Amino acid sequence: MSDSPKHITVLLHEAVDGLAIKPNGIYVDGTFGRGGHSRLILSKLGEQGRLIAIDRDPRAIAEANTITDPRFQIVHSAFSSIPDICDELNLVGKIDGILLDLGVSSPQLDEAERGFSFMRDGPLDMRMDTTKGLSAMEWLAQVSVDDLAWVLKEFGEERFAKRIAQAVVSYNKSATEKISRTLQLAQIIADVVPFKDKHKHPATRSFQAIRIYINSELDELEKALNSALTVLAPEGRLSIISFHSLEDRMVKQFMRKQSKGETVPKGLPILESELNKNIPLKTVGKAIMPSEAEIEANPRSRSAVLRVAEKR
């Protein structure tokens, strides 16, 4: 991200510190965004160091193309393709660290035409990669009440999922023109949510759920997590920032599962060193949240959680 106050990289130093940068190491920034983490990683690398950055947002790719550092390369893709990219570059098992900054970026929220924000009027798009797949508008125009309610409940933990789904589908069936604008959808949702939270817009959970579904965000994360063990070198680090409970739960459970050995009955003559042979990861420290100062400077960082693990 740029140095604009609107585009402040969340947990910048903490996430990069989590990688324990080796000057001549090879690193992957799976979510380039506007380049805040990537630029800091490059500043810590020596002449033989290398950074591969990935993003599926064409605007992020345009920003990355302004970096002329020979140690840096950008790939237009989703971060679930990290194993394929590393395979093509003959880097499987050689990566010293992977950084993922999950969710939607500030520039994406701030640009009304991207359709991510219920606070700005724009076309109802919500795609991270605007060159691929159905937009939110196209999907909502064809979805059933049951399917929409499932998405809102599963990915937004929305308690009024059925009521909202009925309102959205009913509107699209009866109106001469389908729902096509962000504020239009936000108002339809607000009109049917019976209880208002003064600290949260009634459309917050629904917009999150639709965005996650449109971009297959949790599937992407699962693929990236499962491939990390193959891609990372021994002592390679995984540094992941999540912004909502669904993402953080996945990251936490993955790291916990991969850092615990099999349960062995007490009394068996097995050395602890033998048990640890089959444990692929170890967690590094505790989860890190933004400081009060960072939250004050950048309120969007409030829900961020950083978790770090190291391959054994």
UniProtKB/Swiss-Prot annotation:
It comes from the Bacteria. It is found in: Cytoplasm. It catalyses: cytidine(1402) in 16S rRNA + S-adenosyl-L-methionine = N(4)-methylcytidine(1402) in 16S rRNA + S-adenosyl-L-homocysteine + H(+). The keyword rRNA processing applies. SUPFAM superfamilies: Putative methyltransferase TM0872, insert domain, S-adenosyl-L-methionine-dependent methyltransferases. One of its GO terms (cellular component) is cytoplasm. Its EC number is 2.1.1.199. InterPro entries: RsmH, SAM-dep_MeTrfase_MraW_recog, SAM-dependent_MTases_sf. The keyword Cytoplasm applies. Signal peptide: none annotated. GO terms for molecular function: rRNA (cytosine-N4-)-methyltransferase activity. Keywords: Cytoplasm, Methyltransferase, rRNA processing, S-adenosyl-L-methionine, Transferase. Belongs to the methyltransferase superfamily. RsmH family. Specifically methylates the N4 position of cytidine in position 1402 (C1402) of 16S rRNA. HAMAP family: 16SrRNA_methyltr_H (MF_01007). This is Ribosomal RNA small subunit methyltransferase H.
